Amino acid sequence: MRFRHKAAALAATLALPLAGLVGLASPAQAATSATATFAKTSDWGTGFGGSWTVKNTGTTSLSSWTVEWDFPTGTKVTSAWDATVTNSGDHWTAKNVGWNGTLAPGASVSFGFNGSGPGSPSNCKLNGGSCDGTSVPGDAAPSAPGTPTASNITDTSVKLSWSAATDDKGVKNYDVLRDGAKVATVTGTTYTDNGLTKGTAYSYSVKARDTADQTGPASGAVKVTTTGGGDGGNPGTGAEVKMGYFTNWGVYGRNYHVKNLVTSGSADKITHINYAFGNVQGGKCTIGDSYADYDKAYTADQSVDGVADTWDQPLRGNFNQLRKLKAKYPNIKILYSFGGWTWSGGFPDAVKNPAAFAKSCHDLVEDPRWADVFDGIDLDWEYPNACGLSCDETSAPNAFSSMMKAMRAEFGQDYLITAAVTADGSDGGKIDAADYGEASKYIDWYNVMTYDFFGAWAKNGPTAPHSPLTAYDGIPQQGFNTADAMAKFKSKGVPADKLLIGIGFYGRGWTGVTQSAPGGTATGPATGTYEAGIEDYKVLKNSCPATGTIAGTAYAHCGSNWWSYDTPATIKSKMDWAEQQGLGGAFFWEFSGDTANGDWWRHRQRPQVTPAVRTTRRH
């Protein structure tokens, strides 16, 4: 799909408050409490504007203030106002000037600066105390508790025990962390975690909190696998998998966040999420959007668990919200998807050394900051030995299978490895261009992109459904339908239960159309909310309801506009067909296109459906 990937995400970022406000509260003096709040006020690419606000939250006057913080190497203050700002290397100090040092209770003052570089402040102190309110000068945080031991392990529960932490003022309680996210706070040194999934691996650690509400470092981690279970997540016949791709750029203009999976009810029904996208460049897997992925701060009302991010926590953004989602729904497994329509141009260089490429992907997926978030990897190369946004003219015929073989060797058998693949079933088309049959030995399943067969990139038409299940009289291109694509994959030796059918939460359309049935002429793409020629299902179901069906999908003629999209009824017919064919299930693109109450999920008819969110693209 021609969604706005990096460029659009950045543009949307610039249109929003880039950093938001991150509260950094701290008792600044024994008798006077104060908070320091940082905000990035602007960003022009090579530099940014920032401000700090100091507020007296205590009951007595504050006579002076000093704010300290660290910037990463390469980020610095270039000019400042309303404070005296100095630095020693990467450590920066701002002190009040003569007129703004005294703050009455409830009063606040701000100072600003311009900076260069991409970094954000860390290790903040206000008048010697920590800016997040967890310490006061002269008061030490508690020590780390002992590494927990696990006992009484069942299909759904485990008992944890640990040795006590020490503190100069006494320990108040302990936070129990499952896979990095807090699941309980207890006053003793034991805890039984219930409601787990059988045959599933978890990691537990503990943090102590003292009577001054300071939190100490985490204990060592103990790994626990519940009893029971099956084959570790491989879908087999597909009856188990209910997957969805979540897009990192959706947090901008679409305002769709991980918490929406909870409020829509989708999280109650899915088993897998593909997180899209990481980039492929320089022969390596790389981060796609660092701000959305792990830096964006979430307020309490935006957060999955209702707890706001702090300015100095080691992981924020979507990755941390996904971690919280897994804590709330421990059955959900998450895969990191790399490439996509926009970022597939790096694959030809990467597969020149498949082992090195696979290692780079493993190192990124298993980065210690988020190693507990991801359970596998999805590769979305569009397309090996063929053309997508760019053309692959250098890869060997076996490049795709060599890549997947290297991925399996690097990640091992305990990780899920999947791939998004073309649905071009035409003679000599994209399926014929790569060795998908050989590669299927190393993957858990293929997400076959059975949509975007036709669209308004052919601005004058003919109008045609973008996701036909079968061929029909007058179809513009033979082989551009789901049935032909699946038949061709099977002929290449791909097992049917490793093939997932793709369905979009959107429609494609033209304007200037007078003919109701498919095959009409047009003058160009219809207007869409985010992109011409494409619109979310949640909009189309009301603005242009379906007026007919063809080849197992729906279409609508409204005024001069003509749209095609799937409805709950056509979804059911496709699921019936997929079951008859022995396919592994289905996936959907993408979560933000669904209604606020998860309309697709409420109408989902069969347990083998594998809803995923994929980017759509031309075949």
Curated annotation (Swiss-Prot):
SMART domains: CBD_II, FN3, Glyco_18. InterPro entries: CBD2 (IPR001919), CBM2/CBM3_carb-bd_dom_sf (IPR008965), CBM2_carb-bd_dom_sf (IPR012291), CBM2_CS (IPR018366), Chitinase_II/V-like_cat (IPR011583), Chitinase_insertion_sf (IPR029070), FN3_dom (IPR003961), FN3_sf (IPR036116). GO terms for biological process: chitin catabolic process; polysaccharide catabolic process. The active site is at 382 (proton donor). PROSITE patterns: CBM2, CBM2_A, EF_HAND_1, FN3, GH18_1, GH18_2. Induction: By chitin. It is an enzyme of class 3 (hydrolase). Gene3D superfamilies: 2.60.40.290, 3.10.50.10, Glycosidases (3.20.20.80), Immunoglobulins (2.60.40.10). Residues 1-30 form the signal peptide. Residues 240-619 form the GH18 domain. Residues 31-134 form the CBM2 domain. Belongs to the glycosyl hydrolase 18 family. Chitinase class II subfamily. This is Chitinase C.
